[in-house]
Amino acid sequence: MAILLQTPRLRLRPLTPEDAPRLAALDADTDVLRYIGPPIATSLQGYEEFIAALYPKYFDNKDSSPLYGFWAAEERETGVFLGWFLLRPALDYRFVAEARYEAGQVEIGYRFHQAAWGKGYATEGAQELVRRALLEDRTSAIVSLALVENRASTRVMEKCGLVRDGDVVLPGYAMRGVRYVLWK
């Protein structure tokens, strides 16, 4: 499988159907989901279907940036699955209206196993994805959203150069969201 990119400690590659059990295990951790919301799917088949839908939308779509999609994050030395990153047109986000996203904006997101927290993996991978996305003509800004209480996530955004750009009310969430942006 083609590798999207490597950083000093990470290898990012497109998610494959073989990653479905890894995603299910990641989403089974209530602490991982505490500030994120519901899991991507509720069954192994649901995760497989989620991954399969990424290919026509991002990975096999000639009109899509080669950077867009959901990427498995693996430790380079060991190959251990740590979590994932997403990079996609911001208009693909389910709360696009509430987040005030616009055409040309690219959303970055990430989700990691607890064992990978606090080690700089999210920052390392996100910085590289942000750097590469800003090189594309179609990108006007990098955007991201987190619940205000999720300081670990907002610190990653800040380390990538994004700045807080306002509060967001997300349907179904008791906590307030915050929008971050890095204009090109």
Each predicted region: which residue ranges?
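Conserved active-site tyrosine of GNAT-family acetyltransferases
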Residues: 157
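GNAT-family acyltransferases
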Residues: 1-115, 128-132, 136, 142-145, ...
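Conserved beta-strand-loop-alpha-helix junction that forms the acyl-donor binding cleft
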Residues: 144-154
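Structured interaction and signal-relay segments at domain junctions
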Residues: 160
